[in-house]
Amino acid sequence: MPSQVLLCPPTYFEVRDRKNPYMRVPVDPELAQQQWERLCAALHAAGLQVNLIDPVQDLEDMVFAANQVFVGSHKQIGKFVVPSEMRFPSRQKEVPHYVDWFATRGYNVIALELRGEYLEGGGDLLWHPDRSRVWAGYGIRSSEGGLKRFASAMAHMQIPVTSLHLVDEYFYHLDTCLSPLNAEAAIFYPGAFSSQAQEELKGGWKRLYPIDREEALGFACNGIAVDGRYITSRLTPSLESALRQEQLDPLVVDVSEFEKSGGSVFCMKTFLD
């Protein structure tokens, strides 16, 4: 189970342009700060050590800490990060700040030669909870070529990567439509995936709990399962049923100001281990 997370304060957070279909409404900065502080408190209550990276002016999306790197560990090289190549230039400017944060704390940096391909970190690259593989989404933000280069790098460490084609622009990252609950179970929105990707998911989990489109648009899949709890921005009927069956207690934290920018609880942090 992860023990630490990294977050970025929302000092400069705003909806400045439209990078996804959710980005239509201005943000209330004061309310966003309050919601962010409550999320930090919830993560701490769940037993996680909360670490912070300094926000940078004019990097309004830096608060979404899941995207700038992929974090992993390997018995031979120890903890490592793979820097992202973000599809939007404004978000690419965030990446060096995160890479520096990890490098100064002893993480090995595995820089890929992406050559015009895209790879969006922990938004599209999700560890299976037992670390047996990485689930990798592509098609909206990360490109298929970017995932192939990532998979090649992981193969050198005997880490399998399973690619999943995303087909709905509202579910632009994998973490918006797939949420691992434990090593055997996950919730997902089937409509976000190609038919082949749905088959891959069915073969990789003992129990898959589907949710409907309305629930998925409310970010039901963008929660965090940790320490017997599921931290989420809202509790929907399908989600509540799945959590009950997996013996997870819901912990609801309102992050609606951040959802105006297309990200919820999971998007706002990255695990450090």
Residues of each region from the PLM?
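The feature marks the mature, well-folded catalytic cores of soluble enzymes
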Residues: 1-273
